[in-house]
Amino acid sequence: CIRDSLDGESMPLIHAFMETVESFAQEPSRKHALLDAWVSLKYMVHETQAKGAAAPVHAREYAPVYMDVHTFQSSPAGTALREKWIRGARSFLETQFCEYVEQTIASNPLKAQRGGVPSARATAAAFLRVQLRNAEGAWPPTLSRPLDAATQSPLWALVFHLVRMGHIKDALACVQENEDAIQATDASFLAFFKAWVDDPMRHLPRSMRDHWMGEYVTRFRN
């Protein structure tokens, strides 16, 4: 933010740049890409749109941390700032993807069959119907098993898209409700996934990560 020279209130600077970009008379895709860059920055620094906000982002607020390489890379303040930026960037990508999902469903509502209660799981399943089902209504053979018991959509694709949309609690609930189907091939997946969901920065404990990588090497690379 910057200070308004007329009334001393904080001004959301990134939003001002966004409005400037929107006023450009140029090819839409180029303008959209530039606008996305500013929107992602807004999410990363957590700038609010309201003029005179109670907790604005002040000029050079983060500079003491990121201007010193050692502080940025090695101090708790540097870690906290990087994590804040990561959370903001992830939130932007999740929001952007949710918008794409809604646009896709709206473009083909009959095939989507979302139903009257647009829950996160119903929305993800509707998106998968549009994207993956063929003209006969069949799923691709590689995704036809296992299916989510509630939506009859490919379970692993559903879990992935729930995570991609930022609905990780819904993804965990989906895994828990389909535990029996998962146990047959991935007995430890639920424990690993829950540990990942419960960590604020989406990290696995070192012991779990090492075990997971060992299983990956054994199963997929040998």
Predicted feature locations:
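Acidic, serine/proline-rich low-complexity intrinsically disordered regions
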Residues: 3-162, 169, 173-222
